[in-house]
From Swiss-Prot:
<keyword id="KW-0378">Hydrolase</keyword>
<dbReference type="GO" id="GO:0019544">
    <property type="term" value="P:arginine catabolic process to glutamate"/>
</dbReference>
<feature type="binding site">
    <location>
        <position position="254"/>
    </location>
    <ligand>
        <name>substrate</name>
    </ligand>
</feature>
<comment type="function">
    <text>Catalyzes the hydrolysis of N(2)-succinylarginine into N(2)-succinylornithine, ammonia and CO(2).</text>
</comment>
<dbReference type="InterPro" id="IPR007079">
    <property type="entry name" value="SuccinylArg_d-Hdrlase_AstB"/>
</dbReference>
<dbReference type="InterPro" id="IPR037031">
    <property type="entry name" value="AstB_sf"/>
</dbReference>
<dbReference type="GO" id="GO:0019545">
    <property type="term" value="P:arginine catabolic process to succinate"/>
</dbReference>
<feature type="binding site">
    <location>
        <begin position="137"/>
        <end position="138"/>
    </location>
    <ligand>
        <name>substrate</name>
    </ligand>
</feature>
<dbReference type="Pfam" id="PF04996">
    <property type="entry name" value="AstB"/>
</dbReference>
<comment type="similarity">
    <text>Belongs to the succinylarginine dihydrolase family.</text>
</comment>
<feature type="active site" description="Nucleophile">
    <location>
        <position position="372"/>
    </location>
</feature>
<comment type="subunit">
    <text>Homodimer.</text>
</comment>
<feature type="binding site">
    <location>
        <begin position="19"/>
        <end position="28"/>
    </location>
    <ligand>
        <name>substrate</name>
    </ligand>
</feature>
<feature type="binding site">
    <location>
        <position position="110"/>
    </location>
    <ligand>
        <name>substrate</name>
    </ligand>
</feature>
<feature type="binding site">
    <location>
        <position position="216"/>
    </location>
    <ligand>
        <name>substrate</name>
    </ligand>
</feature>
<protein>
    <recommendedName>
        <fullName>N-succinylarginine dihydrolase</fullName>
        <ecNumber>3.5.3.23</ecNumber>
    </recommendedName>
</protein>
<feature type="active site">
    <location>
        <position position="252"/>
    </location>
</feature>
Amino acid sequence: MNVYELNMDGLVGQTHHYAGLSSGNIASTNNALSISNPQAAARQGLEKMRQLYNMGLKQGLLPPHQRPNLNLLYQLGFKGTPSEQINKAYKTAPELLSACYSASSMWTANAATVSASVDTEDNKVHFTAANLISNLHRHQEADFSKKLLEFIFSNSDYFNHHPLLPKSMGTSDEGAANHNRLCQSHAHSGINLFVYGKKVLGNHQFEQSPIKYPARQTKEASEAIARNHLLNPERVIFACQNPLAIDQGVFHNDVISVANEHVFLVHEEAFYNQAYVLDQLREKADFPLVIIQISKEQISVSEAVDTYLFNSQLITLPDQKNMILIAPAECQANLKVKTCIDGLVADPQNPINSVYYLDLKQSMRNGGGPACLRLRVPLNDYELKAMHQGILIDNDLLDILDKWVLKYYRTELKIPDLADPQLLYECLDALDELTQILKLGSIYPFQS
């Protein structure tokens, strides 16, 4: 049976802006208060989807969340009509208004953790939407992400959805950005590598903690997901992220490593006690595992964070054994990083034989590269057929969405623009039309 890795990219919302809301995300902090271009951001994302679809990959999308989040404004004490809520928040707590307007749901690698049916005891695809409690602007996404995934993957014969993990610091979960799956091919059972930044409960004296920036994913959360998803404990590894890397801006593991099938591309300073982690992978692998370890002399952690090399997508084209690296254009612009990539492509010892550079500047300036923008969902033929078909991409749908973006999206957004109530109504009109395009029904709060 055919098994595909469906890439579900986040469609960038109309309120994409730069507010520096994410501690430990250096690009987000450095570009705070810059002027954004939501239309360009959305079109860059659509072009990414188009390129991967035209390469022969299965491609879908997750729609933007409703913004501003009026319910969150209400919870934070801003009452009245929507216009009054927005005005009060802008005057007294503009940073909270910015959080309520955040378009960060576009980074769907944080939407959930997904387990392939070939890995689970009940042979179903398992989903746990991430609670994202580390940041207010991300935490507000959790419930709607769960609702979306339950709608899109609604057939209980094939799909199993779990509740959010408890909303506590002890079970802080950031989704698939801290999960990798290594396997002979997507059709074979795999090794599930869960990466955490801290252990909260019990004895953790042998592990260090970051000092400058917070660790977001807990070991307790990763362990709970592995249990809930009915994964074989013998095929699961829990690895601690290098705290020194976190302090250099590696806020998720997908900023410092990327896996695809039997290939693991990783920086040598990605993990705490990295030699042991890689030995575990080799020991558990019943397939020819290829580990490509990039040294700090080749590329420093800081350079990896600046260019998001490891936040590239590593993909296998249909009916081919070779792989393509889908990298941000920032990698091409950095001579040292480009030289490293050229070396990877030229090396016959690994299956990566080409690279494709993407312009994702709008997302990159907020700390999100190609891998941040997609949630990987392994599906066989039956599972693919059983999911909601309206969000699956083809060129016709991409053309419709491009026209929709041109119709509704502004070409410039500054922080003071968030005080304009008209932006709210522009967003609602756009989302109302989008649900019809994607056949999602009345899924947004304002539609009920």
